[in-house]
């Protein structure tokens, strides 16, 4: 181990030592990186929460649209049945008219 005129730095050959100041600087640098990562994660967590809320709202909208489409389908089916009855009635009337004309 040798001293090279700097009280903040000592070296040992083939393996290194660091001063308390260097270690604290390294630790502070890592802490700052961790804080940035933590802030990024918090921000991303908030974005995910907002996306989940949007997804839930869109799911509710899809459910409402599905109900509307189902109701419209029922209405179309009812209208089809009504048209079928009207057609049958017209056919009966047409047959009666044909009978009257043939007499």
From Swiss-Prot:
Superkingdom of origin organism: Bacteria
Organism: Mycoplasma pneumoniae (strain ATCC 29342 / M129 / Subtype 1) (Mycoplasmoides pneumoniae)
Pfam family of the protein (one): DUF16
Official protein name in the record: UPF0134 protein MPN_484
Family label: Belongs to the UPF0134 family.
Lineage: Bacteria, Bacillati, Mycoplasmatota, Mycoplasmoidales, Mycoplasmoidaceae
UniProt cross-references to Gene3D superfamilies, sorted A to Z: 6.10.250.40
């Amino acid at each position: 181990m040798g001293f090279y005129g700097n009280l903040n730095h000592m070296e040992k050959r083939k393996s290194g030592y660091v001063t308390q100041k260097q270690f604290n600087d390294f630790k502070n640098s890592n802490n700052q990186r961790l804080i940035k990562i933590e802030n990024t994660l918090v921000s991303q967590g908030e974005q995910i929460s907002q996306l989940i809320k949007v997804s839930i709202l869109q799911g509710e909208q899809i459910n409402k649209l599905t109900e509307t489409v189902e109701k419209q389908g029922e209405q179309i089916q009812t209208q089809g049945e009504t048209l079928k009855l009207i057609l049958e009635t017209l056919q009966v009337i047409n047959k009666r008219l044909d009978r009257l004309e043939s007499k």
